[in-house]
A protein has these predicted regions:
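Activation of the activation-loop gatekeeper triad in protein kinase-fold domains
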Residues: 69-74
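An alpha-helical support segment within catalytic cores of ATP-dependent transferases
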Residues: 4-52, 62
């Protein structure tokens, strides 16, 4: 929780990228999100080693799958890696998740209680990613590739 919620919250508080006129409201919204994630989090998850950024863009195919971009590898619930493979609308994601879990269970039992963690994990990823962008802003590639981050419209939304 610290790495994905509390440390990013501190980054937001000290960031000069968030327009000062919007910072108070943004921090209030971040605090509400953090409280909601904490309220929904439960300790029923089985913790194991994860890729941490497991989406289709980090799987290369040549003679079989090869996972790349392991800098986010960490411990957490299996669903953390599985939900990131989902795409499409809710119905498509539900079917995809059923298929992924069925395949997962060919190798290891899946704790279905973890499904309730998808939305909290999604929120945590969003908060963490935004703080990561802010931390990296001094890299010349970031303002060039993420120009929307300095726009007031982004922070207002």
């Amino acid at each position: 929780m610290n790495e994905y919620l509390f440390a990013p919250r501190d980054v937001f508080e000290h960031s000069t990228l968030i327009p000062s006129a919007l910072k108070k409201d943004f921090l209030r919204a971040a605090d509400k999100l953090i409280a909601a994630v904490i309220a929904q989090w439960h300790g029923n998850a089985d913790i194991l080693r994860l890729h941490g950024d497991c989406h289709a863009g980090n799987i290369l195919w040549r003679d079989g799958p090869m996972f790349v971009d392991l800098d986010d590898a960490r411990n957490g619930p299996a669903i953390q890696d599985l939900w990131m493979l989902l795409n499409g609308d809710k119905a498509e994601q539900r079917m995809q998740l059923e298929t992924i879990i069925e395949a997962y269970e060919e190798f290891s039992p899946f704790n279905s209680d973890e499904i309730a963690l998808i939305e909290p994990l999604r929120a945590m990823r969003f908060v963490y990613y935004l703080a990561w962008l802010i931390r990296r802003w001094d890299d010349p590639a970031f303002p060039r590739n993420f120009p929307w981050l300095t726009g007031e419209d982004y922070w207002r939304s």
